[in-house]
Amino acid sequence: ACGSGNFLIITYKRLRELEIRIWKAMREITNVAMLPFPNISLTQFYGIELDEYACDTATLSLWLAEHQMNVKFQEELYVLPETLPLKPSGHIVCGNACRLDWNTVCPHTPEDEVYIMGNPPYLGSSMQNKEQKEDKAIALGHFKSYKDLDYISIWFYKAAEYIKDSHSKAAFVSTNSICQGEQVAMLWAPLFAMNIEISFAVTSFKWSNNAKHAAAVFCVIVGLQNKSNSSKYIISGKSRTQTNAISCYLTPETTEIIDKKSDRISSFVPKMVRGSMASD
């Protein structure tokens, strides 16, 4: 669900800016007149989008971004890379990301480093239309109680499936509901069973945009990787906490999952008639 390519464009530009800084640093360190050339190519960028018009917009936007960064490359390093004739742009595939095999869109080996990122749609189980429910059944039908999962859960599962047993990583902006309540056990238990862990997390923050009457949505950012001994980081506001593990509740030093129970935990407390769900 790359939309019109915002994530791809920003990532491409930031990498080109980093590349320029590296070339300038190499010149200063070696004091040798080198002929720089860009190594970051649009052919390294992939996206899947359902809307055909958005696909075309993403392709065109990447070409424009390439031209802008080539101009900046010339201003900083006095070399103008060739732009015309137009070379192949990013691999933007028009299709349903929930149903396509991601490895056919961007084939990779366990040794390749592929970074998946995005801002997939958030839709609670009661907000999904018939086609979206079918998407979920196809992708998550083997999950216990998959019908109660948020639509974005599909992306987390397919990303985990893609990066499993490889050097690749993934991260998504997501509704915070996947890290709260009974969705946690439904989604994260199968992901953790695939030897996947949370590499970093940004805890709940309010998502805002320029749309009129935009609903208040609280989001998280969650990174996925294969299990490793590397440090993990939890970012909350302006603070950053280093930890050895991150739970699916985005808390440090544990990966325990609290599953639902149909009976009380002690005979000394009364039976619960209804959970904490707000209802009339």
Residue positions per predicted region:
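Class I SAM-dependent methyltransferase "Motif I" SAM/SAH-binding loop
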Residues: A1-G5
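Conserved SAM-binding loop
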Residues: A58
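Conserved SAM-binding motif I beta-strand of class I
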Residues: F45-I48
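Post-Walker A helix-loop "phosphate-sensing" segment adjacent to the P-loop in P-loop NTPases
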Residues: E17-I22
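Conserved SAM-binding strand-loop segment of SAM-dependent methyltransferases
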Residues: G90-G95
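Conserved SAM/SAH-binding beta-strand->alpha-helix loop
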Residues: D51
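Signature of N6-adenine DNA methyltransferases within the class I
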Residues: I9, R16, C55, W63, ...
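Surface-exposed acidic, glycine/proline-enriched linker/cap segments
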Residues: K24-I40
